[in-house]
């Protein structure tokens, strides 16, 4: 069968929906036991295969149906979609909120919030969603958790998807998985449907704008298209036969990404070399060929899988789950889905979430189902907020970036939580943080940053917990509290943060917030060195201090050590410089927060 160049590009763009929208999340390792597999429904006739998705087919829906009240209309003036469900007053107020944040205009912000409040009182669910945000952060209104939840409930009942995200995240934080899983399941389904009509760049991923306490200059350079070294590496991989790299190179040329000029001829060249999976799709659906041929489809999917294309693994999983052209085998399907999920294929996460949710193929586990649904839901149309926030930040519009990241924080995005917290810490008054009566007071800024860092730490951001501990230890924005500092360091230590281990050792050595215990101090210092060899110098000095205290207690030498409180600050700086939060480099060169593609331990 000959496939035209136009068809190949169409296949490639279609497979985008199955392949290139990689799920971004905090690093995690999933270990499956035989109990996970054997506890589920493995009787191949005991479930309705129609309940599970097929090969990317979905009923076409408009963006208004998928994300009613979308903020896109504010940022893209050529938006053709008419948002009939949202009132003009809502969009007017929303536009003023963003303008006020950019300009640092508290008068305009008060006017904007009043306008949104009026629209919400008239029953507009999208205005109610914004008021939920307003009460949640205390912007021109007194902070009220109850009013925030109430507004989000009304908004969600009216169809606002962002409020459903906010409520789902609240339920998740309270371990109310029975409620969270239902909302995230709906949101994930919407996200999957949106992949086919997404107007965003397929490579747009949440970018962490900071590394530790410093700006993430490498990531920002790449976001501006100023770095091409990683592209050269990717091109080299493509030339060596890596089909995943071929597909990405094709997308770069087709969309003109990463500073490249659009070149459809080059895009076609790379797509035609990579699209085994797309050809398999044509055969399984019978598009452009004489008739459906499941044997041929399976052969192409297997070739795609052999070329490390996660969509090939995903579609093989669908064949076995559905029993299409092969004997139905849910256990075999599960294995393929896990391989695809480890490669970042979002629909594979969606299928696995359904399996954990329903108990088909895997032991029913609402916590795991919720986690996987959330990963997919965060790739929905509302994820465009991240791109607009980054664009604002790159243009120097810190106020707009801060309010957009703050909105995303409420929806449960960890990267947005840490970005917003970092902005308010780094820029202070220049963050344009708006409080109850105008610009945020020092206390309001501290409380806002503390809340954001804490949420990020709950989702696995170890540096966030460390910063909370530092704030309490040094009295930054709050009164010094060694006990709370120790609690925060303990939390960061539980996430294997070496600097937190070092700090706990210091606190035990000096009896600050923790019992004076040189044995425990040495243990924590040793753990810090085991976790990160970059800590060798500060740990060596700290261990020397412990040795002196143990062998020369009540001597002048110990008194000299105690008279040098500034030594700890210097040591902390050394440790911090050597233990900055790790950043995962995607082969594409997008310095983004993303899964480490940790291997799944699958029982044989």
From Swiss-Prot:
Chain coiled-coil ranges: none
Keywords: Glycoprotein, Repeat, Signal
Gene Ontology terms: biological process: ERAD pathway
Region (Disordered): 48-69
Gene3D superfamilies: Tetratricopeptide repeat domain
Glycoprotein is among the record's keywords: yes
Sel1-like repeat residues: 125-160, 244-274, 279-307, 311-344, 346-380, 464-492, 498-528
InterPro entries reported in the protein's UniProt record: HRD3, Sel1-like, TPR-like_helical_dom_sf
Signal peptide positions on this chain: 1-25
Carbohydrate-modified residues: 78, 105, 293
Function: May be involved in the endoplasmic reticulum (ER) quality control system called ER-associated degradation (ERAD).
Family: Belongs to the sel-1 family.
Protein name as annotated: ERAD-associated E3 ubiquitin-protein ligase component HRD3B
Organism per entry: Arabidopsis thaliana (Mouse-ear cress)
């Amino acid at each position: 069968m000959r496939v035209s160049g136009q068809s190949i590009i169409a296949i490639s763009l279609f497979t985008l929906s199955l392949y290139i929208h990689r799920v971004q999340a905090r690093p995690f390792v999933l270990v499956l036991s035989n109990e996970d597999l054997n506890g589920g429904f493995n009787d191949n006739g005991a479930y309705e295969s129609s309940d599970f998705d097929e090969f990317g087919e979905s009923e076409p829906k408009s963006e208004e149906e998928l994300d009613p009240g979308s903020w896109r209309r504010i940022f893209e003036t050529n938006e053709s979609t008419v948002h009939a469900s949202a009132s003009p007053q809502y969009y007017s107020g929303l536009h003023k909120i963003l303008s006020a944040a950019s300009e640092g205009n508290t008068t305009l912000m008060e006017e904007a919030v009043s306008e949104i409040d009026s629209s919400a009182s008239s029953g507009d669910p999208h205005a109610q969603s914004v008021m939920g945000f307003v009460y949640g952060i205390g912007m021109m209104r007194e902070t009220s958790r109850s009013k925030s939840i109430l507004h989000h409930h009304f908004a969600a009942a009216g169809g606002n998807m962002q409020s459903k995200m906010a409520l789902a995240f609240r339920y998740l934080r309270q371990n109310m998985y029975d409620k969270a899983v239902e909302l995230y399941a709906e949101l994930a389904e919407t996200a999957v449907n949106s992949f086919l009509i997404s107007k965003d760049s397929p490579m747009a991923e949440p970018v962490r704008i900071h590394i530790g306490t410093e700006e993430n200059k490498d990531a920002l350079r790449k976001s501006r298209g100023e770095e091409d070294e990683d592209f050269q590496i990717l091109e080299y991989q493509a030339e060596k036969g890596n089909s995943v790299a071929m597909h990405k190179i094709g997308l770069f040329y087709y969309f003109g990404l990463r500073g490249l000029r659009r070149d459809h001829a080059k895009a076609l060249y790379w797509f035609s070399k990579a699209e085994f999976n797309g050809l398999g799709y044509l055969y399984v659906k019978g598009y452009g060929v004489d008739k459906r041929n499941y044997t041929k489809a399976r052969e192409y999917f297997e070739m795609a899988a052999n070329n490390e294309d996660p969509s090939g693994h995903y579609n093989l999983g669908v064949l076995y789950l559905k029993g299409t052209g092969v004997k139905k085998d849910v256990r075999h399907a599960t294995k393929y889905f896990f391989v695809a999920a480890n490669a970042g294929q979002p629909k594979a996460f969606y299928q696995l979430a359904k399996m954990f949710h329903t108990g088909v193929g895997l032991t029913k586990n609402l916590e795991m189902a919720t986690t996987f649904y959330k990963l997919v839901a965060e790739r929905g149309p509302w994820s465009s907020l991240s791109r607009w926030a980054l664009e604002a930040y790159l243009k120097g519009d810190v106020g707009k970036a801060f309010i957009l990241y703050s909105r995303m924080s409420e929806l449960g995005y960890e990267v947005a939580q840490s970005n917003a917290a970092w902005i308010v810490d780094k820029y202070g008054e220049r963050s344009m943080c708006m409080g109850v009566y105008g610009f945020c007071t020092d206390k309001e800024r501290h409380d806002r940053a503390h809340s954001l860092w804490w949420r990020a730490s709950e989702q696995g951001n170890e540096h966030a917990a460390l910063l909370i501990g530092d704030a309490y230890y040094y009295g930054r924005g709050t009164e010094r509290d060694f006990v709370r500092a120790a609690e925060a360091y303990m939390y960061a230590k539980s996430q294997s943060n070496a600097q937190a281990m070092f700090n706990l050792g210091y606190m035990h050595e000096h009896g600050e917030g923790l019992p004076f215990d040189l044995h425990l101090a040495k243990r924590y210092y040793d753990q810090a060195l085991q976790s990160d060899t970059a800590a060798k110098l500060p740990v060596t000095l700290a261990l020397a201090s412990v040795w002196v205290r143990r062998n020369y207690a009540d001597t002048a030498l110990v008194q000299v050590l105690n008279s040098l409180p500034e030594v700890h600050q210097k040591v902390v700086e050394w440790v911090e410089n050597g233990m900055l939060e790790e950043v995962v480099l995607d082969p594409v060169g997008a310095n983004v927060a993303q899964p480490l593609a940790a291997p799944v331990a699958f029982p044989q």
